[in-house]
Structure formats: C-alpha cells, structure tokens
Amino acid sequence: MHGNTQSTASGVKTRRFDDILSEVTQAFEIHARCGSILGGVHLELTGEDVTECTGGARNLADEDLQRAYKTTVDPRLNYEQALELAMKIAAINNS
C-alpha cells in the first residue's frame, strides 16, 4: 500500500481502493506464475468509519474524504473497505 498514495486536486493525501486491489491481484498472479506462494499482505486499516481512501463498495469519491478524514500520517482503509478487500483476497486465494 505504501507505493500508491496520491493527492487529490485539493491536496488531500489518499489511496484508491481499486489501485490497492490491483496491486494485490498482481502480486498473487506473479507468485502463481513463479510457482511460489504469497505469504502475507500488509494493509493500513482501521476499524473506524473513516473516509481516507476512495472507492470500495460505498464508492467513496474525493469529495467524501473531508467527511471523516482523521489520519495524521497515511490514509487507511475503513472497516468496510478492509473487509471487502479481505473477501476479494480470499476469493483470489481460493481460485
């Protein structure tokens, strides 16, 4: 997640859910081609209902970030985005 932080037009630091999912999916594909196993994924997340990363099931947009942007360092997935990503990782891993 560390390599995909972006800034919005108004300068708010964020991450895009689809970019994170793409990064994880690519990692699984690369490991599969190499015959190795991806042993873990590092995610920055919180159990709180923050709006720091865009996308996900609620389709948060840049305009939504100000509603509950609480981080003082890096944007985190909120609890819904984290669960959604975990379910997608499980589906990839079981395919």
Residue ranges of model-derived segments:
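Expand to "…catalyze enediolate/carbanion chemistry for C-C bond making/breaking, isomerization
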Residues: 1-95
